[in-house]
From Swiss-Prot:
Chain residues that bind Zn(2+): 255, 257, 274, 277
Protein name in the entry: tRNA (guanine(26)-N(2))-dimethyltransferase
Key word Methyltransferase present: yes
Organism, scientific name: Encephalitozoon cuniculi (strain GB-M1) (Microsporidian parasite)
Gene3D superfamilies: N2,N2-dimethylguanosine tRNA methyltransferase, C-terminal domain, Vaccinia Virus protein VP39
BP terms from Gene Ontology: tRNA N2-guanine methylation
InterPro entries for this protein: SAM-dependent_MTases_sf, Trm1, tRNA_met_Trm1_C
UniProtKB keywords: Metal-binding, Methyltransferase, RNA-binding, S-adenosyl-L-methionine, Transferase, tRNA processing, tRNA-binding, Zinc
GO molecular function terms attached to this record: tRNA (guanine(26)-N2)-dimethyltransferase activity; tRNA binding
Domain Trm1 methyltransferase, chain residue ranges per copy: 9-382
Superkingdom of origin: Eukaryota
EC class: transferase
Length: 432
């Protein structure tokens, strides 16, 4: 919300106010990003007396000041490389009535010796800052313009045991469909058109897990979200069990018919011929093959909400019911490949669940499902539904309704109309 205070224009978000000028970068589409970050950090550290939070690219200070005002046990370090941004941060800290503040400039060693203030403003390259303070922060929030890949190593050095690494990547187009750039930036080979909005999540978590193993660390995904034009990922960094990286990352054979075949570590023989259509499949990956969310954290956040933020509530409910299988199936795309009319999502879910398979919605794509059913079974259901052959349905035991588990999912209010904000990225403001 924007307003004028005399000659000064301001922007308010929740309880935080910042000044607005021609070089202020504020994207209202990222409010959800900030909202969920507050809730995740609050839930993960609710039993801690104090936590150190790094807002690595603070810009106006909005995100960091919200951490300060909404998480009572936080000590926040608001960093930016730009002097004009640092001046703005200091001004906005005072504007929000935070007097317990300290300014370090580029005195990174002074940070270790201090720590008495709740708000700490720093002027530094964030990679230099994180490298200079090993195992120092409980939370590191990295929200760049573009890729997050170049900051991961430094963040892993600076995060404490069981700290939370919060990553944003706004280059979702690269992660979804630019095969060459994705391989260069994220060291993962992708296939355009396959589970497009979940591929970025499993690509980034895989990259972080592989980088973490170099520092004798492992990762535990807390939440992984593919929202609008960006992805937002929360990872718990555990300073042990680096060997889990081998078990938790897989290559995947992908086919244009949407068949998938996971290749686990140590698998000696690989048949690249598709079992569904007999075409040659394409080798992609590595991808994170484990769960993308910690359901206990999600339930904890849901339990503490008052229901006012319907978009946040709906997306958390989506995450809570998602099954951990790799990727999802877009119903219109599958029906197009089969040359049949699109069927309702609910019919496919009921049929597969009645056949004994796991099914769920996915927050990544509204008209898609997650399931552990093989593509052959999915196609069989789609074809039977399109043909309307009741005798054949009964013969194969396919029922398109009546599954209690799916009924329970259908009864949940997900606020589907709010899943997408309809807003896109903004250009960076001119330099000051």
């Amino acid at each position: 919300m924007e307003s004028k205070d005399g000659a000064r224009e301001t922007i308010s978000e929740e309880s935080t106010v910042i000044t607005k000028n021609e070089w202020t970068f504020f994207n209202p589409a990222q409010k959800f990003n900030r909202d969920i970050s507050i809730e995740v950090v609050k839930e993960c550290f609710k039993d801690r007396a104090s936590i150190r939070v790094l807002d690595a690219m603070s810009a106006t200070g909005l995100r960091g000041i919200r951490y300060l005002k909404e998480i009572g046990n936080s000590i926040v370090y608001l960093n930016d490389i730009s002097q004009s941004s640092v001046d703005t941060i200091r001004s906005n800290v005072l504007l929000n009535g935070i007097e317990d503040a300290e300014y370090f400039g580029s005195d990174l060693q002074g940070i270790k010796e201090s720590g008495n203030a709740r708000a700490n403003v720093v002027k530094s390259d964030c990679n230099v800052l994180m490298t200079s303070l090993p195992c120092f922060f409980d939370v590191i929030d990295i929200d760049p313009f573009g890729s997050c890949s170049e900051y991961i190593d430094s963040a892993l050095r600076a995060i404490r045991h069981k700290g939370i690494l919060c990553l944003t990547a706004t280059d979702k187009g690269v992660l979804c469909s630019n095969e060459r750039k994705c391989l260069i930036k994220y060291s993962t080979s992708i296939m355009k058109g396959m589970g497009m909005n979940e591929v970025p999540l499993r690509t980034i978590v895989s990259l972080v897990s592989r980088q973490a193993s170099k520092f004798d660390c492992s990762v535990e995904p807390v939440m992984s979200l593919s929202i609008d034009f960006y992805v937002r990922i929360f990872l718990r960094i555990v300073r042990r069990n680096p060997r889990s990286v081998v078990e938790r990352n897989s290559h995947v054979l992908m086919c244009v018919c949407h068949n998938l075949a996971e290749i686990r570590s140590g698998q000696r023989e690989i048949d690249s011929r598709c079992s569904n259509c007999s075409r040659r499949m394409r080798l992609c990956g590595p991808f994170w093959n484990g769960p993308l969310h910690d359901v206990k954290v999600i339930q904890g956040v849901l339990g503490g909400m008052n229901g006012g933020n319907k978009r946040l509530l709906g997306i958390l409910r989506y995450l809570e019911q998602e099954i951990p299988t790799m990727f999802y199936y877009e119903i219109p795309r599958l029906c197009s490949l089969l040359g049949i009319s699109t069927i309702k999502q609910s019919r496919l879910m009921h049929a597969l669940a009645n056949m004994g398979y796991q099914v769920s919605y996915t927050h990544s794509e509204l008209n898609a499902i997650k399931t552990n059913a093989p593509i052959a079974s999915i196609n069989k259901v789609l074809i039977l539904s399109g043909a309307g052959d009741q005798e054949r349905m009964e013969e194969l035991g396919v029922e398109f309704n009546g599954n209690e588990g799916v009924k329970a999912l259908e009864s949940i209010e997900f606020f589907k109309g709010l899943l997408k904000s309809g807003m896109g990225p903004l250009p960076l403001p001119r330099k000051h």
